[in-house]
Amino acid sequence: MATEVVDVLVTGGKATAGPPLGPAVGPLGINIMNVVKEINEKTKDYAGMSVPVKVIVNTDDRSFEIEVGIPPTSALIKTELGLDKGSTEPKAIVAGNLSMEQAVKIAKMKKDSMLSFTLKNATKEVIGTCVSTGINVEGMSPRDAQKAIDAGEFDEYFNE
């Protein structure tokens, strides 16, 4: 069984037969519209976000399987806050304020794809992404929020 794997980044629920999907999958001899339909069905919950998708094609019988990844942390943060984009000057301009509850929620979504062993450390990873997007956490800079987590100020969020 020979397989080909195509990795693409698509907008949730809005994949089309055009680039980047069409040119990558078309030469493999499978019905592109069936692929698009299945991708859109599986990514509809991530509407508007960039979602990593793997199309695994069995070149012998031309069957395919779709694996949907989790959107990048920055996309989840921006969606949670209702932002179109982060700050253009992260150190000078604040684009939004993430609550600790929202940070923990995103960490739980991403935990399986992160290197952290604990929810507390996964949340600190999410907050680290806030540094580059210009988003504060609980009204403080992301670095200060990470220090506050280390000091135990938000331990009530990590009791599982």
Swiss-Prot record:
Keyword Transport: no
Pfam families: Ribosomal_L11, Ribosomal_L11_N
InterPro entries for this protein: Ribosomal_uL11, Ribosomal_uL11_C, Ribosomal_uL11_C_sf, Ribosomal_uL11_N, Ribosomal_uL11_N_sf
GO CC, alphabetical: large ribosomal subunit
GO biological process: translation
Keyword tags: Ribonucleoprotein, Ribosomal protein, RNA-binding, rRNA-binding
A GO molecular-function annotation: large ribosomal subunit rRNA binding
Subunit record text: Part of the ribosomal stalk of the 50S ribosomal subunit. Interacts with L10 and the large rRNA to form the base of the stalk. L10 forms an elongated spine to which L12 dimers bind in a sequential fashion forming a multimeric L10(L12)X complex.
Function: Forms part of the ribosomal stalk which helps the ribosome interact with GTP-bound translation factors.
Family (UniProt): Belongs to the universal ribosomal protein uL11 family.
Annotated protein name in UniProt: Large ribosomal subunit protein uL11
Primary gene name: rpl11
